[in-house]
């Protein structure tokens, strides 16, 4: 979320003071109506690596799916402008059953994707609409390019009650700092189907602005959805990454400092 301009409260974007003390990358790169994706994440990471040279780089945040995609390798994607992307998004949105449609145009690709994996189904359909080629055929012609740099993976393990309390406090802080006003200004300015409007904290605020939630219900919805997301992220990290170091905040901090002193580029 921090990649988007003007979403500061909802993304808990680092303050100017924090950015002054520690160099941050990939902040404020996209307008609200532009699309974020794994290839862009990879490009921004590579740009940061070029600039940082011998400095230690930390990739932080909840984008574990993007990170996994980069480590396993990405195929080059069709080059599309924003208007083309929005047109494809709308075409996919008209499908009654996206998975059934994918199965009809590319049974081989559909076989590799679970029917509930909406993200991968969506990406496959994007390729089809952009190239008019079955995704499996497209990937044969555009094989994955693996990430060629050493990387060490860390994940925080926080006791459930402590984590839930932090989520509740963070939600309260966002609301106190003007979350609703921030989203209201953006929602009146940009297309309603913009990608950031689907994010937790943002989508609930929109429901509040549309008078579908009370203020109390808004806060409860953000807390509940964030807790569910944290659980999914934890499961994903533990099941999808090998050699993952899991520990408390202090343990992870100590491990990162130890590895940074050894000169490993992370």
Swiss-Prot record:
It catalyses: adenosine(37) in tRNA + dimethylallyl diphosphate = N(6)-dimethylallyladenosine(37) in tRNA + diphosphate. Keywords: ATP-binding, Magnesium, Nucleotide-binding, Transferase, tRNA processing. Its EC number is 2.5.1.75. GO terms for molecular function: ATP binding; tRNA dimethylallyltransferase activity. The keyword Disulfide bond does not apply. InterPro entries: Dimethylallyltransferase, IPT, P-loop_NTPase. It comes from the Bacteria. Its cofactor is Mg(2+). The keyword tRNA processing applies. It is an enzyme of class 2 (transferase). The record marks 63 as: Interaction with substrate tRNA. NCBIfam families: miaA. Monomer. Belongs to the IPP transferase family. Catalyzes the transfer of a dimethylallyl group onto the adenine at position 37 in tRNAs that read codons beginning with uridine, leading to the formation of N6-(dimethylallyl)adenosine (i(6)A). This is tRNA dimethylallyltransferase. It comes from Helicobacter acinonychis (strain Sheeba). The lineage of its organism: Bacteria, Pseudomonadati, Campylobacterota, Epsilonproteobacteria, Campylobacterales. The gene is miaA.
């Amino acid at each position: 979320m921090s990649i988007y301009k003007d979403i500061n409260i909802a993304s808990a974007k680092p303050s100017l003071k924090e950015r002054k003390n520690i160099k941050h990358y990939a902040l404020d790169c996209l307008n609200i109506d532009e699309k974020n994706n794994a290839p862009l994440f990879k490009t921004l990471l590579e740009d940061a690596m070029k600039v940082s040279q011998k400095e230690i780089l930390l990739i932080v945040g909840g984008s574990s799916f993007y990170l996994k995609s980069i480590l396993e390798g990405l195929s080059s994607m069709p080059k599309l402008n924003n208007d083309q992307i929005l047109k494809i998004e709308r075409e996919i949105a008209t499908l009654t059953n996206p998975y059934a449609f994918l199965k009809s145009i590319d049974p081989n690709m559909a076989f590799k994707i679970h029917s509930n994996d909406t993200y991968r189904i969506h990406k496959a359909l994007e390729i089809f609409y952009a190239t008019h080629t079955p995704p499996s055929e497209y990937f044969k012609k555009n094989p994955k390019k693996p990430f060629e740099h050493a990387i060490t993976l860390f994940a925080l393990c926080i006791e459930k009650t402590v984590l839930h309390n932090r989520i509740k406090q963070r939600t309260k802080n966002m609301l106190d700092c003007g979350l609703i006003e921030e989203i209201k200004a953006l929602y009146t300015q940009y297309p309603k189907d913009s990608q950031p409007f689907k994010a937790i904290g943002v989508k609930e605020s929109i429901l509040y602005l549309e008078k579908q939630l009370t203020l109390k219900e808004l806060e409860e919805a953000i807390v509940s959805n964030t807790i569910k997301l944290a659980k999914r992220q934890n499961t994903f990290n533990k099941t999808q990454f090998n050699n993952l170091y899991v520990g408390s905040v202090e343990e992870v901090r100590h491990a990162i400092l130890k590895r940074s002193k050894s000169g490993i580029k992370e």
